[in-house]
Amino acid sequence: METVLKALRPTLRLAKLEGDAAFVFAPTEKIDASMLLDTIEGCYFAFRRRLQNIRQATTCMCNACVLIPNLNLKFFAHHGAFVRQRIAGREELAGTDVILVHRLMKNSVAEATRLQAYALFTASCVAAMRIDPSALEMREHQETYEHIGEVAMWIHDLEARWKHELEHRRVLIEVNDTETVLETMLPAPPPVVWEYMTDPAKRMQWQVGTDRVDQANPAGGRRGTGTTNHCVHGPGAIVEEILDWRPFEYFTIRATVPGLGPTTYTIFFTTEGAGTHLQFRLKKLKNREQRDLWTGGAREQWLGGLGRWFERLAELLTAEMAAREPEPPVPVSRHSAPSHGH
């Protein structure tokens, strides 16, 4: 549970622990489709890596440890209204939609699909996310609940996403292929910094001098590998293409920069205390004309601009974190292995 909660937060806020399940939520205006999908998949990937580590580190043959390979996670996502109320001194979420998201846990998905690891999204959640579920290879599903009726849903296969994660070729700038490095500390955890650096609306808040960021996503409407951005600065524009996308860890972009031409860079996100160590690596410039431009003034202009942007970003993140409600502490497991996953 500790691994799961750490991966879900701070994108999602813990409402309550319910046995071996965690009830989490986020206001609609605080999260978009890409962040929700990246957070869910990232949580599942962290869970699978944790299971691998436990299997490799233990020789215990007790029943709990023997059953570790059978553990899995399921996610249930719904979009709706809720009210906050205090019950026995504790704040809880209530309402018809809160009841529905709990009812989703009783379903026939395993029987219908044989999937053991999945994320289940109601049709209302998919509509709010503004994605094309078919293009994202989700499966249509339907359940009927007493006093609620038929509920249309979409199933996202997390086992397939894990397989893709393991097989997908990484594209990143290695240290020995780096032209220059820019590093800074930002006062927020990686998921928050990631959102500010990848959401076009949030980029406009700190990229001073940018008139607009036009984003085109691959089929399905989700940010990731293949996404292109047109960052318009007066008469010029920087055209970006995402080559690799590892949420909250790093992304790699090929960009065409006015006055410099095509460049490739990777930005790494590393947790340090309550903040994020950000490292920008620019790929070596091997074109002679580009190198002349770089040493002739483009380097100072480019890195100076990035430095000013990151200063503004730090100001925004400081205000963002100060405005957030304090998170309850993550419970620390007393055992080396989780008991269940839902």
Predicted regions and their residues:
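Catalytic beta-strand-to-alpha-helix segment of the class III nucleotidyl cyclase homology domain
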Residues: 29-140
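Hydrophobic ligand-binding cavity/cleft-lining segments
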Residues: 167-218, 335-342
